[in-house]
Amino acid sequence: MGQKINPTGFRLAVTKDWASKWFAKSTDFSTVLKQDIDVRNYLRQKLANASVGRVVIERPAKSARITIHSARPGVVIGKKGEDIEVLKRDLQVLMGVPVHVNIEEIRRPELDAQIIADGIAQQLEKRVQFRRAMKRAMQNAMRSGAKGIKIMTSGRLNGADIARSEWYREGRVPLHTLRANVDYATSEAHTTYGVLGLKVWVYTEGNIKSSKPEHESKQRKAGRRNAAAN
């Protein structure tokens, strides 16, 4: 029976980039990694209503740069930049180095897998029917230009005694094609019946072209033809 790999890890260095960009010695690696996890957990709680999609952490020499991708940058910044200053102070305490925070706006939040997953989780916590929440998110994504979307939820759905999983898919979501631009995210909904898990796959904009120059691939093909002819 085939098992599904994490689509983001599967496509690293092909179509996806790392969310943490730094190098550490083996003696410091676990400490730095734990800091990254703490920072992401803090931002997830602090910015729960800011529609945060991706958080990129970079570590230049003895400092840190955090880029927050949000559909609602005004909520992150706050009035006259007050909230972002508080955020920066808290992050400096967590990381122990000077922190620079950048905010980037997500233009189409309906196509961001993390925002979709968090949005469904918030609806489930407000006792919205899980099928209705899932199908509404799928319709919004397809209307916004997605080629395909798949949403899966697991747990005690609608308060059932036995936990189960249900998933819905619209369009196509290629899992084996490395060049396919598949965005993947997970989230959790904490309900009175327990924790529900959510997984979202969003396929957009078709296949991504290879990063290799076109003339290079043509030269290789010509070389293979000459070798075969000889």
UniProtKB/Swiss-Prot annotation:
State a GO cellular component annotated for this protein. Answer: cytosolic small ribosomal subunit
- GO biological processes: translation
Q: Where is this region: Disordered?
A: 210-230
Keywords assigned by UniProt, alphabetized = Ribonucleoprotein, Ribosomal protein, RNA-binding, rRNA-binding
* Domain spans labelled KH type-2: 39-107
Q: Is the keyword Ribosomal protein assigned to this protein? A: yes
Record bears the keyword Membrane: no
- Superkingdom of this entry's organism? Bacteria
Q: Which InterPro entries match?
A: KH_dom, KH_dom-like_a/b, KH_dom_type_2, KH_sf_prok-type, Ribosomal_S3_C_sf, Ribosomal_uS3_bac-typ, Ribosomal_uS3_C, Ribosomal_uS3_CS
Write down the SMART domains for this protein, in alphabetical order.
Answer: KH
Matching entries from CDD domains are given as: KH-II_30S_S3
Q: What's a single GO MF annotation on this record?
A: structural constituent of ribosome
What job does this protein perform?
Answer: Binds the lower part of the 30S subunit head. Binds mRNA in the 70S ribosome, positioning it for translation.
Give the UniProt family note: Belongs to the universal ribosomal protein uS3 family.
Q: How does it assemble?
A: Part of the 30S ribosomal subunit. Forms a tight complex with proteins S10 and S14.
Q: What is this protein called?
A: Small ribosomal subunit protein uS3
Gene this chain is encoded by: rpsC
